[in-house]
Amino acid sequence: MAGCCSVLGSFLFEYDTPRIVLIRSRKVGLMNRAVQLLILAYVIGWVFVWEKGYQETDSVVSSVTTKAKGVAVTNTSQLGFRIWDVADYVIPAQEENSLFIMTNMIVTVNQTQSTCPEIPDKTSICNSDADCTPGSVDTHSSGVATGRCVPFNESVKTCEVAAWCPVENDVGVPTPAFLKAAENFTLLVKNNIWYPKFNFSKRNILPNITTSYLKSCIYNAQTDPFCPIFRLGTIVEDAGHSFQEMAVEGGIMGIQIKWDCNLDRAASLCLPRYSFRRLDTRDLEHNVSPGYNFRFAKYYRDLAGKEQRTLTKAYGIRFDIIVFGKAGKFDIIPTMINVGSGLALLGVATVLCDVIVLYCMKKKYYYRDKKYKYVEDYEQGLSGEMNQ
């Protein structure tokens, strides 16, 4: 019991402190100061200046709306003379953070539900009714086979199908693009951002932008970098691609808006930065199913009341608006945490110098003797004194 009390008393009433040994050595002294300077440079330069370790940060919350403008004219044997405006080529009218502009199409007009020959391919070409299976259908069929082999043209016969007739023939994509004039259409992007932690909000239509300016400006990275109206051709070209080539089979473009705001400075300096890149893979060596397309139909009835439709396979460019960024503002908590971390890192210099002095230098045993006071020797000294 007495032994336990003695140990407890030693724990409670004794204080241990490190022993400081001053070593006069140019090599060790210079190395110690060099390591300390490197650590200070890292803490001040990287942590506080570059990474702004004295700030609390927050991620952006964003909403985006878009509006396209532009008119095109086409004159074809199938559709005749036609004017195309926003209601014709923006499909659908509204999407979340994106916009689709139709640039090319394959149109099949006046389709009705009836029977007609299938488009020729390796599964539909036939010589007689025996080559056609009634009721058969697969994922590439235009309809359900009737079991009859009928002429597709003067030289080819195909299996007849019950479908929307005449069936769509999408073997060849029109080149150049049907709406090649879309290169000069414009896109207005309205972006509102909010940093909830700091209750800070802003939009990309800056306070100094007037109505008259907004009607005339077009984004240019050098001369007009904050105009929110973009020419479609410029978006694609700035991403390193040709609009006319992309318009043929379609694709996906990303409009990136970066908001990095230092809220310790004036709010007017929190500005959007725009960049563009193509998001769909364009690999010429592995060019299977390229581009972007989908189908839609417009239904109506003829004079006799029979239902008809016009089927459109639309090729075009989908513009995805991607908003990202962060804001920072001074806060005492991250500041103190990083200051404490920096002070703790300074201890690395001492540890490194101790390793070199005690294990690498020629006088390592001499320095060890000065650095450490061994407990065994001390106890033996006390015993000797008591025996005397």
UniProtKB/Swiss-Prot annotation:
Main subcellular location of this protein, as a coarse class: membrane
Tissue expression profile of the protein: Widespread distribution in the brain. Strongly expressed in microglial cells. Also expressed in epithelial cells.
Protein name per UniProt: P2X purinoceptor 4
Oligomeric form and interacting partners: Functional P2RXs are organized as homomeric and heteromeric trimers. Forms heterotrimer with P2RX1. Interacts with P2RX7 (via C-terminus); this interaction is functional only in the presence of ATP. Forms heterotrimer with P2RX4; functional differences between homomeric P2RX4 and P2RX4/6 heterotrimer are minor. Interacts with AP1M2.
Stretches in topological domain Cytoplasmic: 1-33, 360-388
Domain of life: Eukaryota
Binding site for CTP: K67, K69, T186, N293, R295, K313
UniProt note on regulation of activity: Activated by ATP. pH-dependent and inhibited by acidic pH.
